[in-house]
């Protein structure tokens, strides 16, 4: 779990984040260091219940957060990585322009691009991944400069807190009741 904070790069007149901000990358929100926490994922039946409160988008989940979890204090836009599960991903990048993954990869499995004629696939070497997601090829096997290429691998599922769902009461008998929050796939952040 990573707590969100508004990035101070925002324009005071429009509220728009500076697109070239190196801290928030133009998103208007920055995140703190990761912290271990735990939560429960509610079923899709409960997620359909969330549709009554607003738009339901594929990738929305309802989290039930116990009061003894550090995540209990989460707020809007906080990021949550599901450390016990992973999913396949595929990203198209351009060599020399955006050699950087926007999602944290668990592992890379394949890199490929089309040949000059565009009629055959060329397999590349698996690059190293820097902490900021930048890809690097130390011993060759990189795509040609300016060429689009595909990176495939596995990543942890990542969500951001979309809305805190209303509940009648937060306490019972002096104890905090679990919270319910709607979380949305981080891929959809800002859309």
Regions found by a protein language model. Name each.
Residues 36-47, 80, 96-104:
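Signals and flexible motifs at protein termini associated with secretion
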Residues 59-73, 136:
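Short alpha-helix capping/helix-loop boundary micro-motifs
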């Amino acid at each position: 779990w990573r707590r969100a904070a508004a990035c101070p790069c925002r324009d005071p007149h429009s509220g728009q984040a500076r697109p070239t901000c190196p801290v928030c990358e133009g998103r208007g929100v920055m995140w703190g260091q990761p912290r271990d926490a735990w939560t429960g994922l509610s079923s899709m039946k409960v997620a359909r219940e969330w549709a009554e409160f607003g738009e339901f988008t594929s990738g929305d989940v309802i989290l039930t957060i116990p009061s003894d979890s550090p995540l209990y204090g989460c707020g809007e836009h906080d990021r949550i990585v599901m450390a016990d599960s992973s999913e396949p991903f595929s990203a198209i990048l351009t060599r020399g322009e955006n050699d950087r993954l926007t999602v944290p990869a668990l592992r890379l499995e394949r890199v490929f691009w089309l040949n000059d004629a565009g009629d055959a696939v060329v397999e590349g070497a698996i690059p190293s991944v820097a902490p900021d997601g930048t890809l690097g090829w130390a011993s060759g096997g990189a795509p040609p400069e300016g060429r689009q290429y595909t990176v495939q691998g596995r990543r942890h599922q990542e969500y951001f807190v979309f809305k805190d769902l209303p509940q009648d009461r937060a306490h019972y008998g002096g104890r905090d009741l679990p919270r319910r929050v709607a979380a949305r796939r981080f891929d959809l952040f800002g859309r």
